[in-house]
Amino acid sequence: MCTATTYRSQDFYFGRTFDYEFNYGEEVTVTPRNYPFPLRHQNALTEHYAMIGIAHMAGDYPLYYDAVNEKGLGMAGLNFPGNAVYSKVQTGKDNIAQFEFIPWILGQCANVQEARVL
């Protein structure tokens, strides 16, 4: 289970626990602009914003738990066991795997409005 909290004032603050019983080898990870992110069902994401967050490195691929991009947009992939639903690949849709979602959004969007459109 993960716990996240936000505090809204003139600024916006986000915090998150990483309360797992064991370690996944996560580490602070910086992905520079335009580092290639191969995607399973789309062309690789090769032009994108830089980001920093907590990730497990699977080879050269950062599996982000949470991150923020250079524009200040951040997101977290919280764990809710038993509640995830995964659809089959659909022609004509953006088919983004769960582990690709954080870099896919943060790489292309500067703010929440852009993420909603995407």
Where are the regions a protein language model picked out?
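A contiguous strand-loop segment
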Residues: M1-K93
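Alpha/propeptide regions of enzymes that mature by internal proteolysis
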Residues: T91-L118
